[in-house]
């Protein structure tokens, strides 16, 4: 085991006694060295099965005032993650797996300013302090890695098929879209088409964004002590278009960042994480069997909620619990019907038998968004978005907007 690498990965917390105490407490209940070995084993299995490829390298080609555009769709997780082993480098404790969904999408524009001193972020028409902080964190690390001077402006817009919801991974789409727009701006089109390379930097904005850089089914390779440059996502399967899916969008005001910190304090966290490595090894051997993924998605949703409840955080609502009760009752009489949810009360359902979904919906009158595999809807919005972004950049030619955030 590369202990030097592991020492480097935790060096960022040396000045923060609370983080150091938490890390020590977690390590006392989890075999970090064993998780590292299991992660290395998974990496080798990915190589052997042809899923893994070394991230490519690109040279920066910056042009002052250059504007680039990108899009992304969100994901729905089967093998989930909560909690970072290395928050500074956004390295999770375990690998995670998801599929792309079309419940929303995100468009992003990125402008480079050679002499700029302050990055700016406008999300859905407003200067957004939360995403500004996330962007600044990611951009500072990005600029340091490639010795880039200057600043970047982002104009971002989300397009939803619902009014308001939590747990539909909008942040993953934002992270992947802004990362691809940035990569396109700095390295050009070839780099922007490299989903693995894009996923490396989407990770710095949002962990789930790593997987949103890919279409189909993807896995984020992450584990304690790994080289942060290898902490990327890989496509492990195409979308199974025979699988019907949809979601009941529900809203809550639970902050995901809060869920991350609560999860790692749970007495059940170590067991939950260790089980994931066994699941991923089996999935690789079985070529990511979709039926296994669907079952894992169900079980992992229940475990995730148990872990958060053990820390006093309840992410479900009366509405989502009512739907979940109906789902469990329906499942007891119907095989081939699956469900899952991420860090929020929006519950997704799946089945290869369309009639099962139709039958279930007859007894549940809540708003329902039917999923599809048509990921070209962004094209209908891109022209107007490009015009809006260009108008915005023209109106804000590069003044320091820090005071507005």
Curated annotation (Swiss-Prot):
Pathway assigned to this chain's UniProt record: Isoprenoid biosynthesis; isopentenyl diphosphate biosynthesis via mevalonate pathway
- EC code: 4.1.1.110
Q: Name one GO molecular function term.
A: carboxy-lyase activity
Q: Does the keyword Lipid biosynthesis apply?
A: yes
What's the catalysed reaction?
(R)-3,5-bisphosphomevalonate + H(+) = isopentenyl phosphate + phosphate + CO2
Sorted UniProt keywords: Isoprene biosynthesis, Lipid biosynthesis, Lipid metabolism, Lyase
What Pfam families does the database record attribute to this sequence?
A: MVD-like_N
First-level EC class: lyase
Instruction: Look up the record and give one Gene Ontology term from the biological process aspect.
Output: isopentenyl diphosphate biosynthetic process, mevalonate pathway
Q: What else does UniProt say about it?
A: It is proposed that Thermoplasmatales adapted the classical archaeal mevalonate pathway by replacing mevalonate 5-phosphate decarboxylase (MMD) with two specialized enzymes (mevalonate-3-phosphate 5-kinase and mevalonate 3,5-bisphosphate decarboxylase) in order to produce isoprenoids in extremely acidic environments. It was found that at low pH, the dual function enzyme MMD is unable to carry out the first phosphorylation step, yet retains its ability to perform decarboxylation.
Oligomeric and partner information: Homodimer.
Tell me the function of this protein: Catalyzes the ATP-independent decarboxylation of (R)-mevalonate 3,5-bisphosphate to isopentenyl phosphate. Functions in an alternative mevalonate pathway, only present in extreme acidophiles of the Thermoplasmatales order, which passes through mevalonate 3-phosphate rather than mevalonate 5-phosphate.
Q: Name the protein family.
A: Belongs to the mevalonate 3,5-bisphosphate decarboxylase family.
Q: What is this protein called?
A: Mevalonate 3,5-bisphosphate decarboxylase
Which source organism does the UniProt entry give? Thermoplasma acidophilum (strain ATCC 25905 / DSM 1728 / JCM 9062 / NBRC 15155 / AMRC-C165)
């Amino acid at each position: 085991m590369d202990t030097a690498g592991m020492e480097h990965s935790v060096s960022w917390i040396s000045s923060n006694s609370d983080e150091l105490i938490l890390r020590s407490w977690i390590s006392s209940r989890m075999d970090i060295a064993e998780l590292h070995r299991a992660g290395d084993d998974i990496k080798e299995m990915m190589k052997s099965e042809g899923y893994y490829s070394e991230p490519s390298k690109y040279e920066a080609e910056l042009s002052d005032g250059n504007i680039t555009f990108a899009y992304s769709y969100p994901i729905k997780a089967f093998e989930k993650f909560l909690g970072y082993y290395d928050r500074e480098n956004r390295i999770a404790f375990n690998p995670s797996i998801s599929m792309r969904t079309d419940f929303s999408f995100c468009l992003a524009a990125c402008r480079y300013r050679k002499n700029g001193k302050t990055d700016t972020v406008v999300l859905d028409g407003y200067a957004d302090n939360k995403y500004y902080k996330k962007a600044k964190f990611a951009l500072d690390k990005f600029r340091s890695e490639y010795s880039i001077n200057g600043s970047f402006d982002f104009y971002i817009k989300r397009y939803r098929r619902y009014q308001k919801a939590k747990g539909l991974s909008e942040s993953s789409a934002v992270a992947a879209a802004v990362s691809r727009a940035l990569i396109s701006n700095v390295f050009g089109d070839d780099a922007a088409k490299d989903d693995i390379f894009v996923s490396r930097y989407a990770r710095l904005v949002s962990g789930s964004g790593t997987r949103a850089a890919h279409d189909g089914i993807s896995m984020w390779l992450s584990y304690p002590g790994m080289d942060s440059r290898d902490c990327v996502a890989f496509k492990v399967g195409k979308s199974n278009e025979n699988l019907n899916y949809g979601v009941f969008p529900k809203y809550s005001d639970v902050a995901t960042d809060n869920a991350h910190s609560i999860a790692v304090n749970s007495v059940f966290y170590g067991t939950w994480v260790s089980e994931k490595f066994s699941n991923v090894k089996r999935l690789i051997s079985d070529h990511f069997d979709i039926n296994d993924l669907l079952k894992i998605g169900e079980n992992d949703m229940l475990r995730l909620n148990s872990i958060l409840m053990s820390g006093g955080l309840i992410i479900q609502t009366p509405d989502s619990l009512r739907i979940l009760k109906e789902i469990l009752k329906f499942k007891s009489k119907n095989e081939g019907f699956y469900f899952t949810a991420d860090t929020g009360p929006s519950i997704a359902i799946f089945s290869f038998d369309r009639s099962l979904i139709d039958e279930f919906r007859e007894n549940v009158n809540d708003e329902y968004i039917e999923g599809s595999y048509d990921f070209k809807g962004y094209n209908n919005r891109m022209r107007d978005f490009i015009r809006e972004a260009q108008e915005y950049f023209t109106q804000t030619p590069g003044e320091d907007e820090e005071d507005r955030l």
